[in-house]
Swiss-Prot record:
It catalyses: nicotinate + 5-phospho-alpha-D-ribose 1-diphosphate + ATP + H2O = nicotinate beta-D-ribonucleotide + ADP + phosphate + diphosphate. Pathway: Cofactor biosynthesis; NAD(+) biosynthesis; nicotinate D-ribonucleotide from nicotinate: step 1/1. Gene3D superfamilies: nicotinate phosphoribosyltransferase. The modification Phosphohistidine is found at residue 220. InterPro entries: N/Namide_PRibTrfase, NAPRTase_N, Nic_PRibTrfase, Nic_PRibTrfase-Fam, Nicotinate_pribotase-like_C. One of its GO terms (biological process) is NAD biosynthetic process via the salvage pathway. It comes from Shigella dysenteriae serotype 1 (strain Sd197). Transiently phosphorylated on a His residue during the reaction cycle. Phosphorylation strongly increases the affinity for substrates and increases the rate of nicotinate D-ribonucleotide production. Dephosphorylation regenerates the low-affinity form of the enzyme, leading to product release. The gene is pncB. This is Nicotinate phosphoribosyltransferase.
Length: 400
């Protein structure tokens, strides 16, 4: 499979903002930590036949580097420090950190190496996999079809929100990792820029070129790694929250809540954390139940929920976002991050449900035990039991 061998990626910044935010924190706090991560396809797609084509793209990624104009743009943002950006200028992807294989039709990918380097592979590699698969599966699909679908959805959206005060509705593009293609994502984002409620993108390359606000804070891996970095497993989530505030004391303050379930998170999210963090992000479980828990938690701590932001980003589309907005908009600030339903929404095209997740830190297991049992990831059953015990969790069925 080499007829589509041209590089998918053209910029080191063609990634999600939180990857650079986390990379800087790792660079400053955990320079010598090593990790391993693995690819998962949550669907029944047999993607192993694309292994050779993906391996070619991985090799091509070693030629990406931070360009001078990109460096200058990042330097003007308020949260990057000079030592990190100077290091990032020298950064190159190392393909030796990635193994790609076809395991009886199943695509196997494993990443390993220093966390400060491995952390940048996930998002662009997923985008590469998604685009390569769609090139082969759906050669007839194009940008025009994606735009037509969006225009139709926007007509429905206008009807759905007629008479509704939309002044507190904020939508972000979170669609890099599972996009149909780079071109489709850019076209969709350019169209959404025309809407007053569209506030930014998680993609740093698009944010720079289209003069948009880059959006993102931290991901599950930040909390997962602390399960082995922290000497006390039961304190690992608090350690992760505290370390983030050391790096970003006054900004990038949206905390992800579902690495070890929302209930366990809230037990760790005391008044100091709740006061200093600007808000919370939902990424699994029932969104209404989650939002009600978040608001009740703030109220219990004596914090006005109106001063905080809830970000919803789990499997959203425009209709779901409006339903959540109607439910919560009078009580708390809101933002909505939509990914696949914007950047891979084309008739006859099946989006991929693919992830790359941390599985080890410093040679020891880490786990994600989210509010959606199907998203649970860990090889080591004994560690999962230890994690549940440390965080006083009820039994959660492990995903197969």
């Amino acid at each position: 499979m080499t007829q589509f061998a041209s590089p998918v990626l053209h910029s080191l910044l063609d990634t999600d903002a939180y990857k650079l935010h986390m990379q800087q924190a790792v660079f400053h706090h955990y320079y010598d930590v090593h990790v391993a991560a693995e690819f998962r396809c949550r669907g029944d797609d047999l993607l192993g036949i694309y292994a050779d084509a993906i391996r070619e793209q991985v090799q091509a990624m070693q030629h990406l580097r931070l360009q001078d104009d990109e460096y200058q743009w990042l330097s003007a943002l308020p949260f990057f420090k000079a030592d990190y950006l100077n290091w990032l200028r020298k950064f190159r992807f190392n393909p030796e950190q990635v193994t790609v294989s076809n395991d009886n039709g199943k695509l196997d990918i494993r990443l390993s190496g220093p966390w400060r380097e491995v952390i940048l592979w996930e998002v662009p590699l997923l985008a590469v996999i998604s685009e390569m698969v769609h090139r082969y599966r759906s050669p007839q699909a194009d940008v025009a079809q994606a735009l037509d679908t969006l225009e139709s959805k926007l007509v429905d959206f206008s009807a759905l929100t007629a008479g509704l005060d939309m002044s507190r509705f904020h939508l972000m593009d979170f669609g890099t990792r599972r996009r149909f293609s780079r071109e489709v994502q850019e076209t969709i984002v350019k169209r959404l820029q025309q809407e007053s409620w569209f506030v930014g993108t998680s993609n740093y390359d698009l944010a720079r070129r289209l003069s948009l606000t880059p959006m993102g804070t931290q991901a599950h891996e930040w909390f997962q790694a602390h399960q082995q970095i922290s000497p006390d497993l039961a304190n690992s989530q608090r350690a992760a929250l505290a370390a983030w505030l050391e790096e970003y004391p006054d900004q990038l303050g949206i905390a992800l809540t579902d690495c070890i379930t929302m209930d366990a998170f809230l037990r760790d999210f005391g008044v100091e954390f709740a006061s200093r963090y600007q808000g919370l992000r939902h990424d699994s479980g029932d969104p209404v139940e989650w939002g009600e828990k978040a608001i009740a938690h703030y109220e219990k701590l004596g914090i006005d929920p109106q001063s905080k932001t809830l970000v919803f980003s789990d499997n959203l589309d425009l209709r779901k976002a409006v339903e959540l907005y109607r439910h919560f908009s009078s009580r708390v600030q809101l933002s909505f991050g939509i990914g696949t339903r914007l950047t891979c929404d084309i008739p006859q095209v099946k989006p991929l449900n693919i992830v790359i997740k941390l599985v080890e830190c410093n040679g020891k297991p880490v786990a994600k035990l989210s509010d959606s049992p199907s998203k649970t990831i860990c090889h080591d059953k004994a560690f999962v039991r230890a994690l549940r015990k440390a965080f006083d969790l009820p039994h959660i069925k492990k995903a197969s």
